[in-house]
């Protein structure tokens, strides 16, 4: 099978479709056409049919699919709550811009803290189970109408879900409310999983079950984190499960959109030698990641786990080198995907090095969470925000600065503290990393916030 059911769910395309085809333009919120995450992919168009796969066959670049698309009831509420990517991308960006500098101030002892959990647990929880789920939710809620053919979550239901996410951020920052805070926070991912499973059931999209399973596992990991933290126990296993799910998602989704958009760019600019199509090497690289993370969850200190991570890293480096992503450097909106996937492959090597005792574990984890997650999420957030609001898919100067900041922050956070600098200098380097990384998200909120709160240019 050329593509996993997870990606079929996210993009609504058959796994055997030509790997270089890109699912087409989707509609906007006025009721004329549906808005979907596949707006990220400019051509060809496709027709969502509830309960059925959309089988796209492309015989040559530029071939077009169907122009017939389902019509949704008109929406006349606030633009911010017209589609899931709007409130959740904006909320995640603002939260990252606040939470990361707050953590550095606490870590350096500049300010005190009085959170539900110890400062380190608060930071880990809010990045893994607060910030990332917001972006995940924006992604999924925008993709669902495409693969279900049903009206998207919008208006009051969407605002309620966003409010539940926000409530989770508030209660976890409060002391003394223990189980109540845990229930409030955990209910968000449970609600998201329920929404996804409802769409799967209502449209009989059983082939899309893996995406519901992954979100459900993420929700369970969050609940396990709360149970362990409330008991004063180590939360390592919940953290490893969450990080493992992130690695799998980045390998699958990044491994699909990166060559697709790179290939589109190369075709548009008549550059020969397109990215390699999905092959046995891609399957093996995904398999090695899955095997490595499963072993890591079970036996985090076993040397064989370190070897598995290194093998997974090497195969994924070979994998993404075949996509020729460097040839798209003139369009940062495309090139940032290659950078993000490169961070992901590097994080596998770093995790292997950590298990083998070569690198500090915190540095290895931040290669993934600061580098791969930072670059890939902002790549998706910027491209989706432009495409779904009727704007050209081109990175302006502000967007290039956003990409630069997040990568500079990731470099400082992932490697500088391991450079042997004195403690005082290490704190300075961490502060620089936090300012750059969180600054990228604040700049996204500043530059893209007006886009996200206003109607599409096509309305």
Model-derived regions: residue spans:
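Hydrophobic alpha-helical transmembrane segments of multi-pass integral membrane proteins
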Residues: 6, 37-459
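Compositionally biased low-complexity segments, especially N-terminal hydrophobic helices
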Residues: 7, 29-36
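Small-residue-biased low-complexity repeat regions
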Residues: 15, 24-27, 31
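Acidic/polar hotspots within intrinsically disordered regions
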Residues: 11-14, 18
């Amino acid at each position: 099978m050329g593509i996993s059911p997870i990606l079929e769910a996210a993009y609504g395309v058959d796994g055997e479709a030509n790997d270089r085809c890109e699912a087409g333009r989707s509609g906007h919120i006025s009721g004329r056409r549906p808005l979907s995450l596949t707006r990220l992919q400019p051509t060809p168009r496709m027709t969502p049919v509830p309960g059925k796969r959309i089988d796209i066959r492309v015989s040559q670049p530029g071939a077009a699919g169907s122009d017939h698309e389902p019509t949704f009831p008109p929406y006349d509420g606030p633009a911010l709550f017209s589609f899931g990517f709007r409130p959740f991308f904006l909320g995640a960006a603002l939260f990252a811009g606040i939470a990361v500098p707050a953590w550095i101030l606490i870590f350096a002892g500049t300010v005190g803290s009085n959170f539900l959990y110890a400062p380190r647990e608060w930071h880990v929880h809010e990045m893994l189970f607060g910030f990332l789920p917001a972006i995940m939710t924006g992604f999924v809620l925008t993709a669902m109408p495409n693969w279900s053919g049903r009206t998207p979550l919008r208006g009051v239901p969407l605002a309620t879900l966003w409010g539940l996410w926000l409530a989770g951020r508030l209660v976890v920052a409060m002391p003394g409310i223990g189980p109540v805070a845990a229930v409030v926070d955990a209910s968000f991912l449970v609600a998201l999983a329920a929404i996804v499973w409802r769409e799967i059931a209502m449209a009989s999209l059983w082939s899309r079950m893996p995406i519901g399973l992954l979100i459900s596992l993420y929700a369970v990991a969050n609940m396990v984190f709360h149970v362990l933290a409330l008991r004063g126990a180590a939360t390592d296993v919940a953290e490893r499960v969450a990080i493992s799910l992130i690695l799998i998602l980045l390998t699958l989704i990044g491994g699909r959109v990166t060559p697709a958009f790179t290939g589109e760019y190369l075709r548009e600019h008549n550059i020969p030698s397109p990215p390699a199509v999905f092959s046995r090497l891609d399957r093996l690289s995904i398999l090695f990641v899955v095997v490595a993370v499963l072993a890591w969850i079970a036996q985090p200190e076993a040397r064989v786990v370190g070897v598995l991570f290194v093998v997974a890293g090497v195969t994924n480096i070979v994998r993404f080198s075949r996509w020729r992503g460097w040839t798209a450097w003139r369009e940062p909106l495309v090139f940032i995907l290659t950078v993000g996937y490169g961070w992901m492959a590097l994080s596998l090597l770093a995790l292997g090095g950590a298990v083998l005792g070569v690198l500090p574990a915190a540095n290895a984890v931040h290669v993934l969470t600061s580098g791969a997650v930072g670059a890939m999420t902002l790549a998706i957030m910027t491209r989706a925000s432009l495409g779904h609001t009727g704007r050209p898919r081109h990175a302006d100067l502000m967007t290039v600065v956003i990409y630069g900041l997040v990568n500079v922050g990731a470099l400082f956070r992932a490697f500088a503290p391991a450079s042997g600098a004195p403690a005082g200098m290490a704190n300075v380097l961490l502060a620089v990393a936090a300012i750059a990384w969180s600054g990228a998200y604040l700049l996204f909120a500043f530059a893209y916030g007006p886009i996200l709160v206003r109607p599409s240019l096509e309305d």
